[in-house]
């Protein structure tokens, strides 16, 4: 008699598990860059499990999640901790479609860090979220052109404010398991949840 147990449709894919850790794992490091590299790699393969090994990971930008991704830590031994924050005024008006801003002092910002531009006009608060791509003196380049105005008379600022994890536009089937998220509120402003 024939064995038909193997004669089943293979509709369930096997997920790849990629390990990330400070001193061991498939990818090694202790900050948002190594975590993002892992998430991006798994995304290219259709998804999988990003297994974050024990450690404290310094977050200078959000971990941008992708579809079909499980981010799994090791319980209280896996901590994603936001780096100390900086808020600084702009010293020059910045308009729609500009991709650089000039600040009073660029210390505390770095290439790759997540930022939030904010201004407070008559119609309320205006917010632009972005990532720093270059710093030349007091001029900070952003990853894309702004779609809002940031004017001095509306108290425009640049701040290292971002969510630790973010799932924007078209992201589905994500699971977050066994991770401690530490917003480091002693050294950061609270983020307005409408803009995280």
Feature locations, PLM:
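Beta-propeller domains
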Residues: 193-196
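Extracellular "leader-to-stem" segments immediately downstream of a signal peptide or signal-anchor
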Residues: 1-190
């Amino acid at each position: 008699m024939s064995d038909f147990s193997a004669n089943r449709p293979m509709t369930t894919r096997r997920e790849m598990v990629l390990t990330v850790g400070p001193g061991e794992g498939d990818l090694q490091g202790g900050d948002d860059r190594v975590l993002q590299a892992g998430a991006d790699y798994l995304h290219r393969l259709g998804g999988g499990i990003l297994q974050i090994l024990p450690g404290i990971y310094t977050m200078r930008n959000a971990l941008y999640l992708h579809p079909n991704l499980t981010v799994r830590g090791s319980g209280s031994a896996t901590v994603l901790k936001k780096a100390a924050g900086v808020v600084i005024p702009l010293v020059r008006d910045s308009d729609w479609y500009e991709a650089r801003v000039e600040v009073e002092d660029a210390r505390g910002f770095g290439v790759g860090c997540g930022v939030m531009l904010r201004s407070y006009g008559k119609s309320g608060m205006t917010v632009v979220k972005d990532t720093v791509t270059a710093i030349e003196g007091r001029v900070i380049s952003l990853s894309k052109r702004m779609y809002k105005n940031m004017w001095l008379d509306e108290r425009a600022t640049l701040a290292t404010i971002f969510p630790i994890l973010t799932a924007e536009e078209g992201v589905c089937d994500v699971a977050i398991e066994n991770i401690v998220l530490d917003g480091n509120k002693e050294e950061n402003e609270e983020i307005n949840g409408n803009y995280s």
